[in-house]
């Protein structure tokens, strides 16, 4: 008899997790390993968020919808978790988004 095994993603990415990261001041590294980041603002109405790096520079808002699209492509295998690949879909965000997804464990499966 063959057992059917459901594959569950190993990452914990979600809108709720992003809000939790902001509330708990959780820090993570950008993909280049040079910038430590954290989420400093959440806009529930626009469903977007802001990040701040270790030197105090705050990003412009990133819409969760864009992040979710990239996340799905990574897990479906149509996009690799590399900064320059992500930059094609979300210009200038590749380094930060890649680091965020690595924090969530998207590179583990």
Residue map of PLM features:
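Intrinsically disordered, charged low-complexity linkers and terminal tails
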Residues: 1-109
């Amino acid at each position: 008899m063959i057992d059917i095994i459901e594959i569950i993603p190993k990452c914990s990415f979600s809108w709720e997790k992003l809000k939790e990261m902001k509330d708990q001041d959780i820090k993570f590294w950008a993909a280049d390993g040079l910038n430590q980041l954290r989420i400093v603002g959440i806009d529930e109405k626009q469903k977007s968020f802001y990040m701040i790096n270790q030197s105090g520079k705050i990003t412009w808002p990133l819409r969760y919808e864009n992040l979710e699209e990239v996340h799905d492509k990574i897990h479906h295998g149509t996009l690799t978790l590399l900064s320059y690949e992500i930059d094609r879909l979300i210009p200038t965000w590749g380094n930060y988004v890649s680091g965020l997804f690595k924090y969530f464990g998207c590179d583990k499966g």
